[in-house]
Design a protein with these regions (language model features):
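PP2C/PPM-type serine/threonine phosphatase catalytic domain
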Residues: 1-171
Length: 171
C-alpha cells in the first residue's frame, strides 16, 4: 500500500572491502526477541548478495513468526525473480511478504495483530540498494556510524513535520 511505496529503495555508494555485522537486543521491556536476520554474501537469485533484518510485533509467537516468515518469503521471492533490477526485485519481494503476512494474520486467530518491520540491502558493484519498512534501521560504519534509513513511525513523522524535536523524540 501507500506506506510500502514510501519505502523507496535507496542507492548508496558502497565500498568493496565490506564486512557485515548484525546485532539484536531484546531490550529491557520484552521477554522474547522477535528479530530475524538473514545475510548472504553469495548470490541470491539475480542479486549478488542479500542482507535482511526483520523485527516482529504482535506478541508471543506471532511477532517471532511474522519476522522469520517474512524474511523466508522475501528470500524465496528473490530467488525466483527473473528481473535483474535490484529495486524492482526487492520491492516485489517485500510486497509479496507483506501480502502473505497480512493474509495469514486474517486467517489464523493466533496470528492476529502480527506484523514486522524490515530492512533489506544488496550491494551491486559500487552501490548499495536499501529498502526499509517500519523502524528497522540500516547503518554504515566508516570511521563513524551513519544511519542510512529513515524510520517509518508516527514519532519520526512528527519530527519530520516539525511538531516535536529529535531530542523530544528520543525521550
Amino acid at each position: 500500500g501507500k506506506r510500502l511505496r514510501s519505502a523507496v529503495t535507496k542507492k548508496q555508494k558502497a565500498r568493496s572491502d565490506m564486512r557485515v555485522y548484525s546485532a539484536t537486543n531484546i531490550g529491557m521491556k520484552r521477554k522474547m526477541n522477535q528479530d530475524y536476520v538473514f545475510a548472504s554474501q553469495t548470490p541470491v537469485g539475480n542479486l549478488p548478495n542479500l542482507f535482511a533484518v526483520a523485527d516482529g510485533m504482535g506478541g508471543h509467537n506471532a511477532g517471532d513468526y511474522a519476522s522469520s516468515h517474512a524474511v523466508r518469503i522475501l528470500v524465496d521471492e528473490i530467488r525466483e525473480d527473473t528481473d535483474y533490477n535490484p529495486v524492482k526485485v526487492i520491492r516485489h519481494a517485500i510486497e509479496t511478504a507483506n501480502t502473505e503476512i497480512i493474509e495469514q494474520a486474517q486467517k489464523d486467530e493466533k496470528l492476529r495483530g502480527m506484523g514486522t518491520t524490515m530492512v533489506v540491502a544488496t550491494i551491486v558493484g559500487q552501490y548499495a540498494y536499501v529498502a526499509n519498512v517500519g523502524d528497522s534501521r540500516l547503518y554504515v560504519a566508516d570511521k563513524q556510524l551513519r544511519q542510512v534509513t529513515r524510520d517509518h513511525s508516527l514519532v519520526q513523522e512528527m519530527v519530520r513535520m516539525g511538531e516535536i524535536t529529535a531530542e523530544e523524540a528520543r525521550n
